[in-house]
């Protein structure tokens, strides 16, 4: 055993002062002294439980003692009689065994591979022990779940990630997926439940038993987001549902996750074999799967972006050359060749590395270096986490913990440890880059082209100076360019830029100036780019990105030249520069039906319990997607209606994620309303009005939302902090509004307007579906019925969605007096014009003026309310373009007029989109769009003025 270093020997005196009575310095062994000095977690634990220290001193932990965990836990749970005592015993057991593992690890009594094995077996033992106890308790309450043949059905648990691979770290959370075999009902209980309900309740109780913090702490943080559909999917799925999902919708990243999936507990029964056989074809393809390479390249980019996004310079997991990259290297070979090479199908990393060497897929020396680096990094990670039982992979900044880690890693001091760490991570990074490296480099021709611009940048020319490379520009443009460069250099003098930043900037600027100044609009483009550069000069990683990836620089210049809005967004949120790396995705927005899945994958990288990071991630995802939509718009690959479709689908994905987060937070605090025990879903819906409801969102549109629930009176929640069910839904809606509007470093998510709810701002924020129906039937004004034309459910379970659709259809198909309706709609439009009228008399306001977008919307709404009682099909759609189609198809409006209004409408909306990209207000010269305006005005007179 290595003697304590000088700093730790000094710290030992602080430890002595904390020891309880009966513990004397002389009574403790050198081993105990070392462990208690190294780990505050171990010290706190033995202070609370002195008998554990006596146990450790008399019999040191053994390498194979994990074989006894199940028996020890069974003894501990023998006297458990309820959920509360179960939770207490689980926490007590976990802490006791973790102290033993920390002892063995700190003193190197067992090797590092065995430590990983012990940590994984401990988690599996606790998961299975809790599941089995709770399964029996649930069967006593509701009966045993059986298939139609009466065969009892078990809950199977897939351990994912490091748990599945037997490589869990000291303070890891656990990723799980729950499944059960076949549908059926419970038998022999006080009341019958279908199997889905039984296993959902069992799953909820199991998560609570493991995850919920109590005075004794928690067992493990449980993350269920890897299950099909993530947080929005069922908590537990049948085998059939799992098979359907992975066959029809399984994504590449879910294949990567499933490589390590392992069934927890005794898993050689028929059900377990069936589940494994079902999943294997999804993970390992029978052929050599080179199609995965591009997906893996994308993953590499995601890793790099995460490192930049979170500033992970000292992170041994996610930083360059860290644990994640070793895992990635191994998965490359598993996913490409695993279907043909069974030896690559191991869930654990080290055996798979051996197989890679045996198959000669990597040089022996590379494999040897990866193995040594992996064990070094995993030991360092576990020691770091065992100091405070804290889930971290970031190297400490304080001297005490640095001294602890240096001693634990058998280094003389911290600099020596950092040197060893740097060497290991450099070896990993080299293999990682060689495997799928695609970095771009300058050609000699590019270097030659940029040389004259190096002089322009470094010589600090004055605006009246002449230089041949700017001779092609007009005099005024040349002066502006030189002034912009000079002003930018002055701005740099005010910034704390280090030597590395200066060096990268001096490499970047000649290339940037060469590209910008070859354009006719050089001065305008440079004026948009220099504020962005000024914002990132102290963040060298972003300068390096633009310097090392010429393609990204070219896209930056093109987009900033085309749109000041994009330039402003990039300057405000430099994280978006990562999106410029891949033109394949930059100009091809996410498929409209894939936003939810993309967002779910993005959020998986953020701890579920870290609300601040979750809020940031939502905003960053939205901004990245907005950039891609705008880039495609500028490139002409998205017509106006498709732009709005993408913006709308993106907003719906955001609403879905925000509701999921708010729901999770509320249920953790209060439980869920008890009426949900008898039905599927959450009894909650979000209705989108206006541009969201009509699939017509613009780049800066806010969201018009109302919230509905179906909670009966006198229902309470079922959590420890019980509240009224309707109060729960009110707080849920308030939480949703908060998550949307909270300003983080990445701004707000959306402005949300909930004033279209019954009784407007004076009404309740969330309304019962029955009260909403009654209000619409008896109290709503005509303008509220107009608004209902453009309303639809954007989040909600099928039951509430159906209720809302019925109310909407009933209101819209109510027979109305044509003359009265005409007058009310016309007067409302006149009020709007008076209130929101154009302040620029010499300009045409595209939305608000006569002949503009709002007039077309009012015509469509009027005709639906006027004729839907005769033609109920008019209620089908909520967007203006398809409403105009329906009016023509149902003989209300002449087909030529409907088509002309549609063209006018899309033309005007297209102009609004483009004005937004230019950061210009929504008005143009009076001479613009005269043909479209005349056509709209004629239709207005025909339908809303003529008798």
UniProtKB/Swiss-Prot annotation:
Residues 450-947 are annotated as: Adenylyl transferase. The keyword Cell cycle does not apply. It is an enzyme of class 2 (transferase). Pfam families: GlnD_UR_UTase, GlnE. GO terms for biological process: regulation of glutamine family amino acid metabolic process. Its EC number is 2.7.7.89, 2.7.7.42. Disulfide bonds: none annotated. Residues 1-440 are annotated as: Adenylyl removase. Keywords: ATP-binding, Magnesium, Multifunctional enzyme, Nucleotide-binding, Nucleotidyltransferase, Transferase. One of its GO terms (molecular function) is magnesium ion binding. It comes from the Bacteria. Involved in the regulation of glutamine synthetase GlnA, a key enzyme in the process to assimilate ammonia. When cellular nitrogen levels are high, the C-terminal adenylyl transferase (AT) inactivates GlnA by covalent transfer of an adenylyl group from ATP to specific tyrosine residue of GlnA, thus reducing its activity. Conversely, when nitrogen levels are low, the N-terminal adenylyl removase (AR) activates GlnA by removing the adenylyl group by phosphorolysis, increasing its activity. Belongs to the GlnE family. HAMAP family: GlnE. This is Bifunctional glutamine synthetase adenylyltransferase/adenylyl-removing enzyme. It comes from Salmonella paratyphi B (strain ATCC BAA-1250 / SPB7). The gene is glnE.
